[in-house]
Regions:
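Conserved ATP-binding loop and adjacent catalytic segment of the adenylate-forming AMP-binding
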Residues: 3-6, 150
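Ser/Thr-glycine-rich phosphate-binding loops at phosphate-binding pockets of nucleotides
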Residues: 9, 33-34, 124-126
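Short clusters of hydrophobic/aromatic residues that line enzyme substrate/ligand-binding pockets
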Residues: 1-2, 31
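Conserved C-terminal "lid"/linker of ANL adenylate-forming enzymes
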Residues: 56, 95-160
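Active-site metal-binding loops of divalent metal-dependent hydrolases
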Residues: 5, 11-12
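AMP-binding/adenylate-forming catalytic core of the ANL superfamily
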Residues: 12-104, 115
């Protein structure tokens, strides 16, 4: 639908100095933390995806005081020791926490070996992550981790 000369698609974007538009995420993917601030998970997930230890990731944090990354260990790292994987992803979290806004900082990571798929209900037929499914599966644990991380002022990793 066109309103005020704009086509409303549900996408968020940024415009550079030359007038080019870049899609930065979907409005419906944003969530509000306990501080009442909105987090755009897509750019954070994209940066986290640079870590070779993970192949799928989803940032959760609706109503939490810290965000938590849920990540699937990459097939190439499945035989690596867990402590090596944890050290790598927590290093990535620490680096990202240094550049994201304060309310978007992560308190930790939930790691799993089970890939997300259409068959297990986590991906859509177009291979997009169903964020509500991630929240249903990992939300309670993520909420507890967010509280623990905020209280202890440390990064936490858990396996599932």
């Amino acid at each position: 639908m066109i309103q005020d000369g704009w086509l409303h698609t549900g996408d968020r974007f940024r415009q550079d100095e030359d007038g080019f538009l870049y899609i930065t995420g979907r409005i419906k993917d944003y969530f509000k933390t306990i501080q009442g601030k909105f987090v755009a998970p897509t750019p954070i997930e994209a940066q986290f995806a640079d870590n070779p230890c993970v192949e799928q990731q989803c940032l959760v944090g609706l109503g939490m005081n810290k965000t938590i990354m849920v990540a699937v260990v990459s097939e190439t790292m499945r035989d690596a020791p867990r402590d090596v994987i944890e050290a790598s992803v927590l290093d990535t979290v620490e680096q990202l926490n240094g550049v994201v806004e304060k309310h978007a900082r992560m308190g930790g990571v939930i790691l799993t070996y089970e890939p997300w798929s259409i068959e297990n209900g986590v991906l859509t037929p177009t291979l997009k992550i169903k964020r509500d499914q991630i929240s249903d599966r990992f939300g309670e644990e993520a909420s507890a981790m967010a509280v623990e991380s905020a209280e202890s002022k440390t990064l936490i990793s858990r396996w599932r």
